[in-house]
């Protein structure tokens, strides 16, 4: 900045010397004007040399404007310097106005036009500087106002939240004081859920022990009663049937509590005694008496005995068995095949034929005819529906040999 100012000062001083020469020539031409005026002009021109010129080139002004925009938050020294520059500019403008008034009688020259241009440039430069300053000040004010508003709002929100928390605490304390029932003191060191589970487990264990004790007592009583019933003489098994009912009645009379399980056991014992009296078959002890029906068990045992017992000698064969054994298809091979299929043991045909009666012969002939007719009919149906894939039941030799006359 200082170097630029010095260059500008030199340039203006160089320019001012020819201007003074011109003025001197003019003064020589116009002899009517007094010397006092010329001396004043010389003084003013001398003062101008020493004074700092504020008119600058366009490039310098651009640089100054850029620097002013960059340095928005300038220091106080720069502001003071700018104020001094303003004062100087105002003084220069006043002096120029005076000169205008004095030089009204003079003819117009090139120096006036140059001074006007300088004034115009100076005014523009002042306007730009004032604008940049006003902008920087406005920005500072906005930033400060924003920061202040934010800080205020933060303080307010914090204060509000604190006040709300205080109010909540006060309300809670009031509620606690108003409630008549005193809440139990909770021990933070112990886990209440675990304590509750342990207490529940203890209760269950106690209940189990009590139940087991009751069952033991009931079993002991039942055993004593059975022993007493066994010691009493029984005439026959039929008389033993009402003993379980008597036991139940004895239990009721003694005042002990009869459970439904005991009643069921007594009923099943009575039913077993009844079946034993009727069939003579007792249910084994390894079966659960409440799960097995004694009557059905006795029937199954009878069937097993009949199945597994051996054949008695002198048993006559039934009529149907004799008929199947004496059956004749008119062909030896067919007869043998049929007997094998039916499980009939092979006997000599001579013996069987000798023993056959006249009635038996008639029945055998009728059977042979019936089988032949059935075989032919089956072959006919088979040939029509299944395109002769299979012929006959397997007893006849061939379909073609027999012919269709027997139908």
From Swiss-Prot:
Keywords: Coiled coil. It comes from Danio rerio (Zebrafish). Residues 1-12, 56-96, 200-227 have a biased composition (Basic and acidic residues). Residues 1-239 are annotated as: Disordered. It comes from the Eukaryota. Residues 24-55, 97-178 have a biased composition (Basic residues). Residues 191-221 form a coiled coil. Belongs to the RSRC2 family. Disulfide bonds: none annotated. This is Arginine/serine-rich coiled-coil protein 2.
